[in-house]
Amino acid sequence: MKLAAIDVGLKRIGTAICLDGRIVMPQNAILRKNRNQAAHDVVSFLEEWEIEKLVVGLPKGGSSSEEMERRIQHFVSLLELDIPVVYQDEQGSSFEAKEMTQGQFRHKKDGKIDSIAAKIILERHLSL
């Protein structure tokens, strides 16, 4: 089964795929100009890779997690997908991504960290 994960942020959406059930690869992040454009770009990404299941990072715990959870679920509803969508705890994934890449490249706002966070989210889902 071909899987994808997204790490939904306010400015960028990190993406990762797993096509063989074993190897998870981060992909280019999607720049979020507005909700509709971002939703369209996510759907195009899923169609391009013929994804059969989407894993979405969802924050659990923390002071602002309820608001972000609501925003993420609303964003996912805009996708109008015909494939299964599951939510995976994303707590600490962005911090872990920054730790993993420390010194490898400058932490520019190009979405690399977001997509590595999506990779971590998908790896967590696969290890369940």
Curated annotation (Swiss-Prot):
Highest taxon listed in the record's lineage: Bacteria
Enzyme Commission identifier(s): 3.1.-.-
Keyword DNA damage annotated: no
GO cellular component, one term: cytosol
InterPro entries named among the record's database cross-references: RNaseH-like_sf, YqgF, YqgF/RNaseH-like_dom, YqgF/RNaseH-like_dom_sf
GO biological process, one term: rRNA 5'-end processing
EC primary class: hydrolase
UniProt key word Nuclease: yes
Record's keyword terms, sorted: Cytoplasm, Hydrolase, Nuclease, Ribosome biogenesis
Gene Ontology molecular function: nuclease activity
Localization per Swiss-Prot or TrEMBL: Cytoplasm
Family as reported in the entry's similarity comment: Belongs to the YqgF nuclease family.
PANTHER family: POLYNUCLEOTIDYL TRANSFERASE, RIBONUCLEASE H-LIKE SUPERFAMILY PROTEIN
Classification via HAMAP family: Nuclease_YqgF
Function: Could be a nuclease involved in processing of the 5'-end of pre-16S rRNA.
Name of the molecule in the record: Putative pre-16S rRNA nuclease
